[in-house]
Amino acid sequence: MAQFYSAKRRTTTRQIITVSVNDLDSFGQGVARHNGKTLFIPGLLPQENAEVTVTEDKKQYARAKVVRRLSDSPERETPRCPHFGVCGGCQQQHASVDLQQRSKSAALARLMKHEVSEVIADVPWGYRRRARLSLNYLPKTQQLQMGFRKAGSSDIVDVKQCPILVPQLEALLPKVRACLGSLQAMRHLGHVELVQATSGTLMILRHTAPLSSADREKLECFSHSEGLDLYLAPDSEILETVSGEMPWYDSNGLRLTFSPRDFIQVNAGVNQKMVARALEWLDVEPEDRVLDLFCGMGNFTLPLATQAASVVGVEGVPALVEKGQQNARLNGLQNVTFYHENLEEDVTKQPWAKNGFDKVLLDPARAGAAGVMQQIIKLEPIRIVYVSCNPATLARDSEALLKAGYTIARLAMLDMFPHTGHLESMVLFSRVK
């Protein structure tokens, strides 16, 4: 009788190698060389030696993890957050702020093939004025998890503190946890958002089943005792205001109202400096006509209108156009108009563009602005400021302007998200005479 044996599972022992790290990439990974190949190692810093094992081996590069660190960089710091290394929110708390800024600036300079002229930064801790915390009910313990996703996973890190949040929001975390953990609807909660506006603190609760009257009463009592504006979201389309007025924030001396679900820059300090520097770079004169593309609800548009003869803001989301118009009225600005347009189409043929523009500002999403670069070139502005949240699409879009005779006059790294791998930037293009 034939007998069949299952093959023994092959076991491979990963080789331990010793490496010296010579660089830090913009994502906070140590960069070393081994056998002529670039090696990326999370958790290591320049000037550090370590024993590592290779976890992924590609043709051009490899990834490794630390087995034992043999030396420490003088720029290594003790992370402030007890969740660092598990939570996916921050990647660089182990590095000095100066090293973080240098590595991001170097990465930006390489992509843009141009020197970074300045870093626009603010406080490195307590800067984040918005947080979205995932909620998950654990049947075994009958407890509610509240926190951020683990690095590279959909699992939740139960967050007790978060030092990058503005102090008002960090102080709220245990109170929000206790309130939500006492609700009958604990099993049917999706996430909670906390927003710190100039007007006050907002709490937006996403729930997937109707709330009982007892739960609603608990939430209302909590919002009143903590001085919160409370919003309930039974689905992705509906937002019910339970308490509070229209929120607003200050932007360079102006008051901008927004809906709790509207995008606002999470770093208020860097946003203020970024807007001020953009106006300075554009060198706005009282007789200038200025165009603001991807304008949102007027973060740049309205401050521009305080200096220019006229400003046109163009946006693809109708609700944001309406909000921009409302903010212009609230601030008594009559020289600014907002238009809803598909920015993939040629907007230079619109009636509002017939007189051209002296200066142009654009602040697109991560996908960049490939569809509008030729339109901007047609308008022949003297100066262009491009604000970017994705250096790769910025580099791609810049090529069109450089080929059309523009040059990079200034390049800034925006340290909008300290301790993370996010890299934002701003470029001034000038037309060659």
Curated annotation (Swiss-Prot):
UniProt-listed Pfam families: TRAM (PF01938), tRNA_U5-meth_tr (PF05958)
GO biological process, one term: rRNA base methylation
Domain TRAM positions: 10-68
Enzyme Commission number, as recorded: 2.1.1.190
Active site: residue positions: C389 (nucleophile)
SUPFAM superfamilies recorded: Nucleic acid-binding proteins, S-adenosyl-L-methionine-dependent methyltransferases
Domain of life (superkingdom): Bacteria
Keywords, alphabetical: 4Fe-4S, Iron, Iron-sulfur, Metal-binding, Methyltransferase, rRNA processing, S-adenosyl-L-methionine, Transferase
UniProt-listed InterPro entries: 23S_rRNA_MeTrfase_RlmD (IPR001566), MeTrfase_TrmA_AS (IPR030390), MeTrfase_TrmA_CS (IPR030391), NA-bd_OB-fold (IPR012340), SAM-dependent_MTases_sf (IPR029063), TRAM_dom (IPR002792), U5_MeTrfase_fam (IPR010280)
UniProt catalytic activity: uridine(1939) in 23S rRNA + S-adenosyl-L-methionine = 5-methyluridine(1939) in 23S rRNA + S-adenosyl-L-homocysteine + H(+)
One GO molecular-function entry: RNA binding
This protein's record includes keyword Nucleotidyltransferase: no
Positions bound to [4Fe-4S] cluster: C81, C87, C90, C162
Residues where S-adenosyl-L-methionine binds: Q265, F294, N299, E315, N342, D363
Family note: Belongs to the class I-like SAM-binding methyltransferase superfamily. RNA M5U methyltransferase family. RlmD subfamily.
Primary role: Catalyzes the formation of 5-methyl-uridine at position 1939 (m5U1939) in 23S rRNA.
UniProt protein name: 23S rRNA (uracil(1939)-C(5))-methyltransferase RlmD
